[in-house]
Amino acid sequence: MRKKIFNWLGKGFVALSAEGKPAASTAAEAHGIFQRFNEELKGLGLSLDNTVRSRLWGRDRESRDQGSIERSKALSGKARSASSSFICPIHFDSDAHVALDLLAMRPARADAQKFLKEYEPPIVPLRYLVYDSVVVLSGVTAVLPTLEDQMANILPRIEGSLKDAGSSWERAVKASFLLHRSQKFETLDQLFQKQVKAKIPQMEYYHVDGYSSEGKLIEIEVTATV
């Protein structure tokens, strides 16, 4: 397991990353990761309820799907949070079938509560959360013929969620782009800058091999402030 403790946006954050340990099933691997995460967070006076974002990695589609089901169980109720998931065999250093990245936040105000916004109707991913003035959106995707088509669909939806949360692209502090390996980062950047003029302080890029369903070419995660 990797653990990083840092301050950002006037809050305390804990980033945890781990691959599954040998288990009877992928679901059991994922369950074990969340148990380990919860123990780490408890040692810092936090719990899974402080989760604001999780990113799930599967070795293949079946692993992603089973891991996603287990994550929905582990991060339910007060632990519900922004999420994304990917298929990416080269992400793994072990023989694990599933890996997880989790970001937990210690709010500056002890009485701060998460505001959870669902899609209508609700689906597996949360639309976004607001926690002590921090806005965290789940990864946003689309199934359309080309990357250009998908970006033209995704970016206005992100803008709508930011506006609904009391934020905007101008208040975005981080954007993560998880691009299908068949696509070029240069093309992605051109498409993004064509539609979004705001200067985002942190922008990170990954190549992945698959998503929650076939036909997706990009998933974008955004964090902002209100």
Question: Across the structure, where does each feature detected by a protein language model lie?
Answer:
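N-terminal presequence-like segments and the immediate start of the first folded domain
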Residues: 1-173, 179-226
